[in-house]
């Protein structure tokens, strides 16, 4: 469709600030755009600018049909080039390019998080991770060896993907075969005997067929932690038939195996804000921090996982303006782990003498044996057309999805206490066997959606979307009877101790209507202002498939609870400057989350909570000059409880694991044809942690700065080297902390990574 432009109530209390921000950024952006135009006018031949490898111009998800610069949402796209330059080998590392997003939460007091435990704008986003627009379930670490780009969308994503976190989603785009042949390989070695190799082979066969193979292997020790090791292997073959024609068939497979040592963290003794949990343990107030290398697990701890994903996608171009796609995917993620962690509190400390070096702390064994499966078929149609003088950019579709999860019950493991300052990991508990007390969850979803962008005039656009999800969740769980402790049940007459007894068998069905609407006005050819409003819902058990009977007061997943609802307002501006090589954005946002489930003082749950996250965010991505690239951003966010029980340790209304200030910037410069230099810095402000009645633990973590650097050298067209240095100034900081505050994960110390990249 041809056009002069590339068309394929309550006010915020900080609106005055944002207006000033927009006024400030507008003349700067206009001046930069004018400078680029002036430079073009001074030449006799005007060449089209080369798109920046640091700022992909388009989302790979067909639901987002407009360019990133014209999308009325806060969206960060982390390109493959950024991932390579930074040596980011997993999703959590790649997300360091997005301000305020990270793995800040280390789990509850009795268990720990694993994998990509991401928080974004005050909410757990670990269950809103997608691969090619399809939900990827499982608490595992996701490698980037088969990733083309990572798309981070802030604000409710229910209209885009169905039930999801109220504050954002993450979409990893897989590599696909392309219309050129070549081989890229890398070999890396680094601190703590880090070893990694990757292979990316693309081969064209005939005129319309191409195959691609990505392979990865990695073994490493954690540079800052004793005993913690990680090992993973992956293979991802793919083939496309009909490349360059109107009919294309893509076949993809992904297999990843991981053998890791889980890390339960170390005691927070000695951190700012720590105090002994009782008068009898007051010596801990002066005994100093534990060695951050200490490992409080056992030599038997393990975290094994296997991911298998098979995808078939067929695309047909009905005409030049209309394409229909059908995607079928089957995926299974199996995870089995034993993770040992300390148990906080004065009652768990044993004091054989007055010397704190002899004191011990109780340990708990966290176990998981789970299998997640998803089977989905999705059909999408995109089309650009006119109705009269109004242009349309339409994306519509239907989705059928079945997600299942089985948590296998295992027998409990008893562990001896561990010395607080001199832990001994040479323990082999054994006895980790299944007991038949399983939990099974299944959710079937049918969804239909439609999005449209209307070009009203040359400069003015309206957009909107609606999605209807019809879902049905079934859940049953059993408990081994005759046990002790929380959740224990007595054995019915005639049932042997340890036998599985069904305790929950229930179901929940319903409809979710999510929608969004926005407007965009182009102030110039390269700059716009926009507004957007979105509504997103998530039903009870929407994250973990777990349900409880209606009226059962001791569960947050009761079937009589209403869906959680998030309403987000956003106003922003986006500018493409320097001949459209650099994208500048600024946005003011507010998200109100309703129907939050709160735990009462007696341990029961009620649904009366309300949260609010509001603030602003600015970002930059692209090229300042052909040789100078950067990506970064800053956010200021205030996350509070508007109604409900305060969840912060200090009794404030602040939401935990949400830094009020966060900054990130990475910049790379091509100094000569053969030498490149890069540097980056990120800041995570102080964060409140959760509260569960723990005594003496830190109420918040302190803010910190971390700097990274890179040096690249090209030997010839077939070989180049890069040296990455992480945490350049060896900053000591708290990377994550658990809810009670008894345990934390220290940030990784200064490390080095040397990589040889080969191209053929």
From Swiss-Prot:
It is a multi-pass membrane protein. The keyword Transferase does not apply. The keyword Transmembrane applies. One of its GO terms (molecular function) is signaling receptor activity. It holds the Pfam family Plug. It comes from the Bacteria. Gene3D superfamilies: TonB-dependent receptor, beta-barrel domain, TonB-dependent receptor, plug domain. Residues 67-175 form the TBDR plug domain. A motif (TonB C-terminal box) lies at residues 743-760. It is found in: Cell outer membrane. GO terms for cellular component: cell outer membrane. Residues 180-760 form the TBDR beta-barrel domain. Keywords: Cell outer membrane, Ion transport, Iron, Iron transport, Membrane, Receptor, Signal, TonB box, Transmembrane, Transmembrane beta strand, Transport. Residues 1-31 form the signal peptide. PANTHER family: CATECHOLATE SIDEROPHORE RECEPTOR FIU, FERRICHROME IRON RECEPTOR-RELATED. Involved in the active transport across the outer membrane of iron complexed with catecholate siderophores such as dihydroxybenzoylserine and dihydroxybenzoate. It derives its energy for transport by interacting with the trans-periplasmic membrane protein TonB. Can also transport catechol-substituted cephalosporins. Receptor for microcins M, H47 and E492. Belongs to the TonB-dependent receptor family. This is Catecholate siderophore receptor Fiu. It comes from Escherichia coli O6:H1 (strain CFT073 / ATCC 700928 / UPEC). The lineage of its organism: Bacteria, Pseudomonadati, Pseudomonadota, Gammaproteobacteria, Enterobacterales.
